[in-house]
UniProtKB/Swiss-Prot annotation:
Annotated region described as Disordered, given as residue ranges: 80-139, 185-266, 306-346, 437-491, 818-841
Annotated protein name in UniProt: Coiled-coil and C2 domain-containing protein 1A
PANTHER family, A to Z: COILED-COIL AND C2 DOMAIN-CONTAINING PROTEIN 1-LIKE, COILED-COIL AND C2 DOMAIN-CONTAINING PROTEIN 1A
Domain notes: The C2 domain is required for the repression.
Subcellular location(s) of the protein: Cytoplasm; Nucleus; Cytoplasm, Cytoskeleton, Microtubule organizing center, Centrosome
GO function term, MF aspect, one: DNA-binding transcription factor activity, RNA polymerase II-specific
Keyword list, A-Z: Coiled coil, Cytoplasm, Cytoskeleton, DNA-binding, Intellectual disability, Nucleus, Phosphoprotein, Repressor, Transcription, Transcription regulation
Residues forming coiled coils: 346-392, 484-517
PROSITE patterns per record: C2
Disease link: Intellectual developmental disorder, autosomal recessive 3: A disorder characterized by significantly below average general intellectual functioning associated with impairments in adaptive behavior and manifested during the developmental period.
């Protein structure tokens, strides 16, 4: 590398000399220096001839000499670009001068000044020609405003974690914006993603319309900067063989910097020559190619690798520019963006999975590049999406506004139309309804939707429009399939909301009739508040039922307030009171369980208990009508109903824990004493809040037995949210000591110890154990029964299946009163089921033995699940309930029916006997031995029952 001997001259001397020779003219296609009318052609020719020949135009015309060849032009141009100081000091070759960093910086400064003069004068702060980036700068400004708005919203909401996260993104955006204004290259992946607070779409349209200019600035490698230019986009198709022979002679050829500068100079001179010949189009084209070398030279100066195989060919080998190249460059630039963005999702789950996959890919790319900070950031976002997907699959509501949105993806469920300050449920639901209406609009709007979705890539979307319409029309039935899968839940949700609104309106009407204006207004406001939820539910959107107000209860609905009808005896009135009390208790139980499941967001169980509450209301209306008419008590019966309920102890507060010491069993006897001489008490130690302040107590002394029954309870103080309490129940538990009470001058003697683990309180509100009493580590044979109870589990609600005796009242006929308790003076409060002649054909008859077998098998399954502290599946509980109801109904029919129904039952048993026989034979031939054994066992049950019936 050549070093200067003297001090460097003042900057700009080479530029001044170049300007004097007329080389540095602006060949921009705007026509500032190249007018189309040819007014300055003579001046340009004079400057060019003065440059190459050094004589005035008149002498050249007299001599009749033409312009010099291109080699001379290259030589003169290289001489003009040399520094005068170096010419005076020593003669150096052209390559050494071009490799000098100071001269390159000076030349770039001159070129930047010339381009800035030819362009608009306002942007003075942008010294480099490639610095302006309208697309990226606008995107950064809008993203900056978006993050500022998000920080303000988080500050108002008091969310400090979100404020810190947005503040980090804001600082990153400010640094990137400052870098791009200085003309530095930035990485697109460093831009923080938009926050989904309602202004997401504002950044996406401004980001994608300019794919041709910002792309060379963003890419780390210089190849895209050359290939994205107009002429070079077509060059690789025709010049692969021309670019590759320049690479092998590496030692013989000049360096990459000199080669790039030489090729850039060729294009500049070609542009000047084309302008001299009047071809302004070719001049502008060559000038654009020459300007594309600036980005490559800048990358090379930073030490980045440069692939010279993508170098444009010499100007004379450049293929002619077709008339429609302006529409072609966006195609390769926007094609990757269209492939990266997946098709619009049909469901919320699909949208969440698409965005999670996009962030997983981004995390993998960041890891491959060694950017651990960005990889960890994307992995945290992936974790958020995984939690959201699990919550959505579990049936819980997902707040999509809290999830980041990848670049190029639209916000989920119409959040782009909401304002960041609009936090009401009404606005969110209205926006979601608009989006749903747009997605499910008529077919004549299909042309408008792709344009809105693909507006950044409109040139590439137009040729693909016809094939895209065909899959849409063909996939229309499949697009409607997901709503069918979730139609049951949506229908339950809609029915629940409509029923609750009806209840609130009825309560408002009752309050108005009682002159309770404030109560009527309150219920009316609550009913009006359900309308946005109803609209969203009708459009298939999930709603948060935990915000639905509870159902108002009218005490008069479950009381016999009217006078009894004429002729009603006191015994019948007493039975009416008993039935009313049972119905009221059932209704209260239904409302309690419904409210509990509503708070959990379980719409299925909530709807089930709401229906049971309505049945209780109808039963109460039947009782009232019969009571007013003076009729005997309507036909009533008890059925076995199985429910999934939330186990809770409402009499306990959240800071109470009850310890029950029930009894001891076969406690060990110390030497010298008989079991009848034991005087036993139990003391316990619960190390909370700490070991020094442990809660301790003891039972009373039970004398003269080794199996004492204490039946004592102790209330312990806890703090459910305290970490020390969690640590105490997970690792320590409660320690018990079984002690024999000493007599006079005798100390107490410890018979053994026991330890109760409390980790089961995480998922259960009651722990009941029979502990083994140990002497150190040696079992003593004695046992101690204890129980611990809290209000509700620590981490999740405890669901359990319970079977209740459910009172059902049959409707009273309109004309004929029900004769149930007339002839019988000592009828029970709840009569037996009435016989109905039409029921024989309403339900098919089954073998009672087979039904009992199925019932016993389900009971064993439910018992095993309860012992394992696992919830009983709803389908198992429903199947058990159906079998119980069918057995009860069929026994009642056979007991009250005559000979006809018994004959029908015998014929049905014969058909079932034949069916099970054939099924056992067929399954045995197929190799299904277990199924064949079960079919054979059922056949034997039917045969035994048929024999008993024939006797």
């Amino acid at each position: 590398m050549h070093k200067r001997k003297g001090p460097p001259g003042p900057p700009g001397r080479g530029a001044a000399a170049a300007r004097q020779l007329g080389l540095l003219v602006d060949l921009s296609p705007d026509g500032l220096m190249i007018p189309e009318d040819g007014a300055n052609d003579e001046e340009l020719e004079a400057e060019f001839l003065a440059l190459v020949g050094g004589q005035p135009p008149a002498l050249e015309k007299l001599k009749g000499k033409g312009p010099l060849p291109m080699e001379a032009i290259e030589k003169m141009a290289s001489l003009c670009m040399r520094d005068p100081d170096e010419d005076e000091e020593e003669g150096t070759d052209e390559d050494d001068l071009e490799a000098d960093d100071d001269l390159l910086a000076e030349l770039n400064e001159v070129l930047g000044e010339e381009q800035k003069a030819s362009e608009t004068p306002p942007p003075v702060a942008q010294p480099k020609p490639e610095a302006p980036h309208p697309g990226l700068e606008t995107t950064l400004q809008e993203r900056l405003a978006l993050y500022q708005t998000a920080i303000e919203s988080a500050r108002q909401a008091g969310d400090s974690a979100k404020m810190r996260r947005y503040d980090r993104g804001l600082k990153t955006l400010e640094n990137l914006l400052a870098s791009i204004r200085k003309g530095n290259a930035i990485d697109e992946a460093d831009i923080p993603p938009p926050v989904a607070i309602g202004k997401g779409p504002a950044s996406t349209p401004t980001y994608s319309p300019a794919p041709t200019q910002p792309a060379p600035r963003i890419a780390s490698a210089p190849e895209p900067r050359v290939t994205l230019e107009g002429p070079s986009a077509t060059a690789p198709a025709s010049s692969p063989g021309l670019a590759k022979p320049q690479m092998p002679p590496g030692p013989c050829s000049p360096g990459p910097l000199a080669q790039l500068q030489s090729r850039q100079r060729d294009y500049k001179l070609a542009a000047l020559h084309a302008k001299q010949q009047g071809d302004t189009t070719a001049a502008a084209r060559h000038f654009r190619v020459a300007k594309s070398f600036d980005a490559v030279l800048e990358a090379l100066s930073r030490g980045e690798p440069v692939d010279l195989s993508c170098l444009p060919p010499p100007p004379d080998q450049l293929p002619p520019d077709p008339p429609s190249p302006p529409s072609q460059p966006p195609t390769p630039a926007t094609a990757p963006s269209t492939t990266e963005v997946p098709p619009p999702p049909r469901t919320l789950l699909e949208a969440l999975e698409q965005r999670m996959e996009r962030y997983q890919v981004a995390a993998a790319q960041a890891k491959s590049k060694g950017d651990q900070r960005k990889a960890r950031m994307h992995e945290r976002i992936v974790k958020q999406y995984q939690d959201a997907i699990r919550a959505h699959k579990a049936g819980r509501a997902v707040d999509v506004a809290e999830l980041p949105v990848p670049p190029g993806f639209p916000p989920i469920q119409g959040l782009e139309a909401t304002k960041p300050t609009q936090q009401s449920l009404v606005g969110v639901l209205e926006t979601a309804m608009k989006l749903a209406n747009q997605d499910e609009g008529p077919e004549d709007e299909e042309d408008e939707v792709p344009k809105k979705q693909n507006s950044p890539v409109a040139p590439t979307a137009q040729p693909k429009a016809p094939p895209s319409r065909t899959p849409q029309s063909g996939s229309a039935p499949t697009a409607k399939a997901p709503p069918k899968a979730t139609s049951t839940r949506a229908q339950q949700q809609l029915a629940f909301l409509e029923g609750r609104k009806k209840q609130l309106l009825q309560a408002a009407l009752r309050a108005k009739q009682k002159n309770d204006v404030e109560g009527a207004k309150m219920h009316l406001r609550q009913a009006k508040g359900l309308e946005p939820m109803l609209e969203a539910s009708r459009n298939g959107l999930p709603v948060d039922i935990t915000k639905v107000p509870p159902a108002p209860v009218n005490k008069d609905d479950f009381a016999l307030v009217q006078r009894p009808g004429p002729g009603l005896s006191q015994e019948a009135a007493r039975r009416y009171g008993e039935l009313t009390k049972l119905i009221r208790q059932q209704h209260e139980m239904c409302l309690n369980h419904s409210n509990q499941f509503t708070q959990l967001g379980n719409i299925t169980e909530t709807t089930k208990f709401e229906k049971l509450a309505e049945d209780c209301k109808r039963s109460m209306d039947i009782l009232k009508q019969a009571f007013v008419r003076g009729l005997p008590t309507p036909t009533a019966r008890f059925e076995q109903r199985t429910f999934s309920v939330i186990k809770i102890f409402p009499d306990l507060s959240s800071n109470d824990m009850l310890l029950f010491i029930v009894k001891g069993i076969n406690l060990p006897t110390p030497p010298g004493l008989s079991p009848g001489d034991l005087d036993v008490f139990v003391r316990f130690d619960f190390p909370y809040p700490n070991v020094e302040e442990a809660q301790k107590d003891k039972t009373s002394v039970i004398k003269n037995t080794d199996s004492p029954e204490f039946k004592e309870q102790f209330k312990l103080c806890i703090n459910r949210s305290h970490r020390g309490f969690r640590r105490a129940i997970q690792t320590k538990g409660i320690k018990f000591e079984v002690v024999h009470k000493g007599g006079l001058f005798k100390t107490d003697r410890v018979l053994g110890t026991a330890q109760l683990k409390l980790d089961a309180l995480e998922i259960a509100c009651e722990v009941r154990e029979i502990l083994e009493v140990l002497d150190g580590r040696r079992p003593t044979g004695g046992r101690l029964e204890v129980m611990v109870r809290i209000r509700e589990p620590l981490t999740a609600q405890q669901l359990e299946t319970t079977t209740e005796r459910w009172l059902v009242i049959d409707p009273v006929p309109a004309a004929v009163p029900t004769q149930v308790a007339g002839p019988k003076g000592k009828a029970p409060p709840v009569p037996a089921p009435a016989r109905e002649s039409g029921n024989r054909s309403a339900r098919p008859l089954h073998s009672l033995s087979v039904l009992a077998f199925d019932q016993e098998r389900l009971e064993r399954k439910i018992l095993a699940l309860r012992q394992a502290r696992r919830p009983v599946p709803p389908e198992v509980a429903q199947q058990y309930q159906d079998i119980m109801q069918r057995s009860q109904w069929q026994r009642a029919q056979l007991e009250q029916g005559g000979v006809g129904i018994r004959r029908e039952y015998a014929a049905q048993l014969e058909r079932q006997l034949q069916f099970y026989t054939e099924a056992a034979r067929r399954l045995g031939n197929d190799g299904s031995r277990d199924a064949a054994k079960e079919a054979l066992y059922r056949r034997n049950l039917v045969e035994s029952e048929l024999q008993r019936l024939r006797r």
